[in-house]
UniProtKB/Swiss-Prot annotation:
One of its GO terms (cellular component) is beta-galactosidase complex. Its EC number is 3.2.1.23. Coiled coil: none annotated. The active site is at residues 141, 312. Keywords: Glycosidase, Hydrolase, Metal-binding, Zinc. This is Beta-galactosidase BgaT. Belongs to the glycosyl hydrolase 42 family. Zn(2+) binds at residues 106, 150, 152, 155. GO terms for biological process: galactose metabolic process. It comes from Thermus brockianus. Gene3D superfamilies: 3.40.50.880, Glycosidases, Golgi alpha-mannosidase II. The gene is bgaT.
């Protein structure tokens, strides 16, 4: 099903009925409203104005549309900030942020918690049983604009309480943090400050705990809203719209409190911000990298425990990236179909109409500011027609699992040990190489059940907890661990028995030395799959295992013990591709290298093909297959669907 984000408060009331009618005629089903409207709902303290929202919901309902109502807490009004200036967050440099944008509040503010409780309760009481309201979105894009981590006095107080609950005694904290180093020892929890503005780098254990605390504060705040909505809106769903390539927040605990996850898909903006080779950025500037959207579909499907929406789908040029090109013709349709192929229940476009004023006036919509349909409108029309002729079976489990660790970016941000070390880049490399081989991938958190997967990819898992170790033990497929796995314990220490720490129960080896390399310095790696290169990171390993790959100096780069493998370097795409081909074949899969812009996705008995490239491609299908969409020759930016077997 399809939907759209709509801001009735931006347009004359006499326009609302026409907009709603056209939404329904287009074939849309859901409309998100209200997530930035606090100042209109409560223009003065305690004076509520529901009339405009009542009317907007009624107009949409009359057209047969279902409403997703956003709680308006991402934008506290000016009067609230003036009354309680302490709700404003403080940045890492100790500067208090000001009113005038959005997300201008601290997650630890008791006052803001109470104001949130009040406005969300009022919203739930008024609309929780409204027949046209299908569900609620809490807030909007938690953490956007660097707002997960605040450094105000309330955060300091809350962090001290969090530490006391976690450690129990200050002596335990001192031991866990290694405060004997640099004379950092604390006598009480009240002496612990936030880990910013230090002269030299802060203690890494201190930093990691603060990042954990800050993420948990977001969950605590979100849970406050969810519990209110559950009480006042029985039977209505509750979701939140997460972001792409955003690592300050661990989304999995939040997902446990939601009915399903949502995320905001902007493939062109994300591609422009990614650390990609320049030629790749240019090749995919108008389409997005072929794996950017799919990666997040798979991630947030896992966060939503099998269910997710795309709450905001890019419809044209955005306004916030360094460069904002126009999507190639057909890409809005392709992105929509790709989301559905990956299991999205709803794809909702942002926004119905481009707004002619304020911060997002250069962000395209399905309509131009002069009310005329924009290019994406006609692509959505085509999707609606195609959806009417194609029944989508339930998604199934992929043959490959990729373990994504939300704490790993924090660990490597605290102590990267190499300027180019980037956890997301390594994870994306593993994901993308697997997809280039025509393999479907499920993203799972550490500790998730791994039964049924033929191949499990663990690009890097710095902290290996018992639950994750047990899941690896119980996996019935081949498991490949990447560099720096098991390199730290829970407290950010090097494991007593050296890395890979607990993984030594599966792989009898020790990492005794590591190095980070500048981008131009490469290491040759050779083995049964050929000669390749690695870079950025290398490890020295002590073991009685015979290496499957060796560096040029003869030392091992890849080791295997039974179903488990350990890769002691950051691989090139060619090296990783050759390795995954061999492991996938051993696992009973049939990897097939695809043309550079082509990607496949299975949904039940249907196979979807997406051509992100500027060249026509011939699809890898046997003769006689039944195509439900397209055909065996796929033009640039086109979609094909066929039935398998």
């Amino acid at each position: 099903m399809l939907g759209v984000c709509y801001y009735p408060e931006h347009w004359p009331r006499e326009r609302w009925s026409e907009d709603a009618r056209r939404m329904r005629e287009l074939g849309l089903a859901y409309v998100r409203v209200g997530e930035f409207a606090w100042a209109l709902l409560e223009p003065e303290p305690g004076r509520l104005d529901w009339a405009w929202l009542d009317e907007a919901v009624a107009v949409l309902a009359q057209a047969g549309l279902k409403v997703v109502l956003g709680t308006p807490t991402a934008t506290p009004p000016k009067w609230l900030v003036d009354r309680y200036p302490e709700i404003l967050p403080v940045d890492r440099e100790g500067r208090r942020r000001r009113f005038g944008g959005r997300r201008h509040y601290c997650f630890s503010s008791p006052v803001y918690h109470e104001e949130t409780r009040r406005i969300v309760t009022l919203l739930g009481e008024r609309y929780g049983k409204h027949p046209a309201v299908a569900g609620f979105q809490t807030d909007n894009e938690y953490g956007c604009h660097g707002t997960v981590r605040c450094y105000c006095e309330r955060c300091q107080d809350a962090f001290r309480k969090w530490l006391e609950e976690r450690y129990g005694s200050i002596d335990v904290l001192n031991e866990a943090w290694g405060t004997v180093f640099w004379s950092q020892r604390y006598r009480t929890f009240q002496e612990v400050e936030l880990p910013n503005l230090t002269v030299a780098e802060a203690n890494p254990s201190h930093l990691l705990d603060y990042y954990r605390f800050a993420s948990e504060q977001v969950r605590r705040y979100n849970r406050l809203q969810v519990e209110i909505l559950r009480a006042h809106a029985p039977g209505k769903f509750v979701t939140h719209n997460f972001m792409g390539f955003f690592t300050d927040l661990n989304p999995f605990p939040l997902g446990e409190d939601l009915d399903f996850a949502s995320w905001d898909s902007y493939p062109l903006g994300f591609t422009d911000l990614m650390p990609l080779p320049e030629e790749e950025k240019l090749r995919y500037a108008r389409t997005g990298h072929p794996d950017v959207a799919a990666f997040h579909h798979d991630l947030y499907r896992a966060v939503g425990r099998g269910r997710f929406w795309v709450m905001e789908q890019q419809p044209g040029p955005v306004n916030w990236a360094p460069h904002n090109p126009n999507p190639a013709p057909g890409m809005v349709r392709l992105w929509t179909w790709e989301a559905l192929a990956n299991g999205a229940e709803v794809v909702s476009y942002f926004r119905w109409r481009q707004v002619p004023f304020a911060q997002e006036q250069m962000h395209a919509g399905l309509h131009r500011p002069d009310y005329a349909p924009d290019a994406a409108f006609f692509e959505v029309q085509r999707v609606v027609e195609e959806l009417g002729a194609l029944s989508l079976p339930p998604p199934g489990q992929a043959p490959v699992a990729l373990v994504y660790d939300p704490e790993a970016p924090w660990v490597y941000e605290v102590q990267p040990h190499g300027a180019e070390w980037n956890y997301l880049a390594l994870v994306f490399l593993f994901y993308s190489v697997a997809r280039r081989l025509g393999l479907d991938v499920d993203i799972v958190p550490p500790g998730a059940a791994l039964q049924g997967y033929r191949l499990v990819l663990v690009p890097s898992l710095p902290i290996v907890r018992e639950k994750a170790l047990n899941a690896f033990r119980e996996a019935d497929g081949i498991v490949l661990f990447g560099p720096r796995s098991g390199s730290k314990n829970e407290n950010f220490h090097i494991p007593q028995g050296l890395p890979p720490g607990p993984l030594q129960a599966l792989l009898p080896l020790k990492v005794v030395r590591v190095e980070s390399l500048p981008p131009g310095l490469r290491e040759e790696v050779e083995g049964p799959w050929g000669r390749f290169s690695s870079g950025l990171w290398r490890e020295w390993v002590e073991t009685d295992l015979s290496p499957l790959l060796r560096f040029a100096d003869g030392l091992g780069a890849l080791f295997r013990a039974g179903r488990y493998l350990y890769l002691a370097a950051w691989p090139s795409p060619e090296l990783l591709g050759a390795l995954l081909v061999g492991l996938a074949q051993e696992g009973g899969l049939s990897p097939k290298p695809l043309p550079s812009g082509l990607r496949l996705r299975w949904r039940g008995h249907l196979v979807f093909a997406f051509n992100y490239g500027p060249e026509e491609v011939v699809l890898p299908v046997p003769s006689g297959v039944r195509f439900r969409l397209g055909g065996p020759r796929l033009s640039p930016y086109e979609v094909a669907v066929w039935e398998e077997g």
